[in-house]
């Protein structure tokens, strides 16, 4: 073994044995410093004959590169080990209260607040939360919800379609949260009482519409579910959500493929001022759609419509947030403007409760 090979073996062993960055730096200086062993070898290149420089020079450069790479790798390893050790030693008591600070704290987004409010209301009525995928199959988004072939919602101008897969099937960004109804009926034996908050997607964008928006809908399936039950649930929800003693509701006949009969629901309000006031006035405001679950949807969910019946309703979370809290433009919900969030957002500890008030 040549002297260069022996030096290479020795230096690599010293680098591997360095147990901290201080020791590693000492090895670097002894090898690559001004008077280091590798540096001294490099100085001899000028005194060598061309033949010696061709053979020994290449070996010395290989040695220098090997030592440099080993030093870099070892330094990275030591730094990562130091970080891991510090993380294991550090602890944060997350139960400690936040220190008072003049700095502005973050706010809860109105949509998150609205979801918490609605969840609190329906949880008090015995409902649970159900969720499903944002990327849906044509079957769950349309077919199982009784959308016939040729329905406008199946067209490209209204729905975001993915490219067909190897089987020719096109998945979609769900246009409503209703597919979760069918998934729940397939997986759960009645009685069913669920609400389904989530994101939905349609090709629409203006002051009151967004390509991505939020919906919440509810589903009740039982042997005796009926329109009277549906009306009571919606009345109790509206009174509690808008924090009024009473509401006057109007059910108008409508059409949805997945319900029969179907209704649009208006509630009486006062629209004379900049903010809509519910529980008073002589105006009407449409807030949601509802109806009895269509027998075909029950069948797709694996239930016998001769034994079970159900009712469902749905509304736009963004829209009812705008109505309740006087927000003029839906697009502001997604602009991440700190000034808007400071004005319309909620403090983190202002959790909605039925006892303390939803928007306290």
UniProtKB/Swiss-Prot annotation:
Organism domain of life: Bacteria
Recorded GO CC terms: cytoplasm
UniProt cross-references to SUPFAM superfamilies, sorted A to Z: Class II aaRS and biotin synthetases (SSF55681), tRNA-binding arm (SSF46589)
SS bonds (residue pairs): none
Catalyzed reaction equations: tRNA(Phe) + L-phenylalanine + ATP = L-phenylalanyl-tRNA(Phe) + AMP + diphosphate + H(+)
PROSITE patterns: AA_TRNA_LIGASE_II
InterPro entries linked: aa-tRNA-synth_II, aa-tRNA-synth_II/BPL/LPL, Phe-tRNA-synth_IIc_asu, Phe-tRNA_ligase_II_N, Phe_tRNA_ligase_alpha1_bac, Phenylalanyl-tRNA_Synthase, tRNA-bd_arm
Cofactor: Mg(2+)
Subunit record text: Tetramer of two alpha and two beta subunits.
Protein name, UniProt field: Phenylalanine--tRNA ligase alpha subunit
Source species: Rhizobium johnstonii (strain DSM 114642 / LMG 32736 / 3841)
Lineage, opening ranks: Bacteria, Pseudomonadati, Pseudomonadota, Alphaproteobacteria, Hyphomicrobiales
